[in-house]
């Protein structure tokens, strides 16, 4: 507990006015294998060129997620792609410190709180370390994901992909590969219970609310994520295969990012930081709100199957316990559900895109059965 950033934040000299870029990798195959614009793999490539190690979140055989270090570019598929659940850190901080003390270059990626934790553990800055923090929405307990899988598929899932691009970058599709060889594609919030409650923060852990690490200055040398909303600013580019936002939070991060050659991008453009629209909340430290359905869901999921717990939590009777002073009523009628819902959004924390996500979640919830 001596180095837990929740008790002792590490010193932070990063800028509050960082340079921001919209980028797309030129390698079509790499882009296909990446959740957004492929920049994480391009940064990792520079680390491997220095005989360095790369740290990040990887799937385990039991479909839990853990942080690992890899030493070969051929192992990058383990670290690519979004994982919308908490990763097990184990002794990864100690592993990183050992590599650094041995003189090896390390590129380490994680949620902002994980980067702050690593920096607190190390106690000082290492010139041979580059940290990447992610534009993170929230990080639900891994137990929720395990329950969702077990209730929906038993032990038949061989692999799971949160951000399948079969229908495009912004399709929000999940791909579930069963041990029988069957592949199931679900269109995110509209067809999948887990995606629905992830994106409207019904699973948001209490410690993710008002996250102190998701603000400027950031704790990582570099911040990366999806550049949602960029098509409205620069409609002349093709974003169907994904685009990344890159924020260089200090000179070291900028210098490392600049090592990637222009030829490795089809798009690399410096843009105003305020252009970060759909992910802009992750720079403000105030958008990790708790869904008004969270307490009901936490209660129901203890005894009910996952999808049914979501349905019960979203039922109209659960809305009565929400303090009216926090609510902004929005009438929504769904022919599918067959009755009128009163949807409520957090007036100060919920933007229009998240309102649409909540509506999509509620209108399609009965498709899961």
Give residue spans per PLM region:
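Low-complexity, highly charged intrinsically disordered N-terminal segments
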Residues: 35, 40-62
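Long, compositionally biased charged/polar accessory segments in the mid-to-C-terminal portions
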Residues: 50-53, 155-369
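Iron-sulfur cluster-binding cysteine motifs and their immediate structural context
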Residues: 1-16, 221-222
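Extended interfacial segments that mediate partner engagement and assembly in macromolecular machines
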Residues: 14-41
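A short alpha->loop->secondary-structure connector
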Residues: 123-135
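Cysteine-centered iron-sulfur cluster-binding motifs in ferredoxin-type domains/subunits
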Residues: 1-7, 38, 113, 204-211
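Glycine-rich phosphate-binding "P-loop"
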Residues: 64-94
